[in-house]
């Protein structure tokens, strides 16, 4: 039996969830040697951003273990509100921004048993647009600091890869300050220059 109803008011078996549940968005593709990395945003996991890797043998899988707080890593940053590069990889070293606690973590693909190593403090500080300098043992990042009064302070910083700044924020070195907007620090191929 058919029913007549005004346009847009009839019951439909198609819901927004039906359309979006299986949606996967891909972004932030990077290559490190024979490995290719990318971020998948998965609607089926409440929009969680997952870091995946295709290794040189063609095997594809999630890369990161649980955080020290036993959380699934959500590879995302809110720097400038819309984000920025939420991870970087160089020579098998990954630095990732976890949306769950706002911290940066280091992960060494070759030494998986070490797990995720916190690199930054908890608090009202965001990091994004990450660039690893393995030669100097640093990760460069745009830092958005919300700890003070008024507007957030945006700086370009260098963070030690050894995890020491997770306990002592004074070890994070400010490279550029005094601007309203800093974005995309990029290391030259020879490692001698940093552009932003």
Language-model region placement:
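A short beta-strand motif characteristic of beta-propeller blades
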Residues: 12-20, 61-77, 114-121, 171-176
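A flexible loop/linker signature enriched in serine peptidases of the S9 family
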Residues: 40-50, 72-81, 96-104, 120-127, ...
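Beta-propeller blade signature
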Residues: 51-57, 154-165
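Short coil turn/linker residues within repeat-based beta-strand modules
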Residues: 58-60, 101, 109-113, 136, ...
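Beta-propeller domains
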Residues: 2-4, 33-72, 105
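Non-catalytic, glycine-rich low-complexity segments
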Residues: 2-30
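Beta-strand C-termini and the immediately following turn/loop, strongest in propeller blades
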Residues: 33, 38-44, 53-55, 86-101, ...
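Conserved beta-propeller blade repeats
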Residues: 21-35, 73-94, 124-139, 177-195
């Amino acid at each position: 039996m058919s029913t007549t109803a005004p346009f847009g008011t009839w019951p439909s078996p198609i819901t927004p969830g039906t359309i979006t549940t299986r949606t996967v968005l891909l972004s932030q593709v990077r290559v490190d040697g024979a490995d290719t990395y990318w971020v998948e945003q998965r609607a089926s996991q409440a929009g969680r951003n997952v870091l995946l890797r295709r290794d040189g043998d063609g095997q594809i899988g999630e890369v990161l273990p649980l955080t020290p707080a036993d959380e699934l890593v959500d590879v995302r940053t809110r720097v400038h509100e819309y984000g920025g590069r939420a991870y970087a990889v160089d020579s098998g070293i990954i630095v990732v921004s976890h949306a769950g606690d706002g911290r940066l973590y280091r992960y060494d693909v070759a030494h998986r048993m070490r797990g995720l190593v916190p690199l930054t403090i908890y608090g009202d500080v965001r990091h994004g647009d990450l660039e690893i300098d393995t030669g100097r043992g640093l990760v460069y990042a745009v830092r958005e600091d919300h700890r003070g009064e008024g507007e957030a302070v945006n700086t370009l910083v260098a963070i030690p890869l050894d995890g020491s700044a997770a306990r002592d924020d004074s070890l994070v070195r400010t490279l550029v300050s005094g601007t309203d907007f800093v974005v995309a620090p990029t290391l030259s191929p020879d490692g001698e220059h940093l552009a932003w």
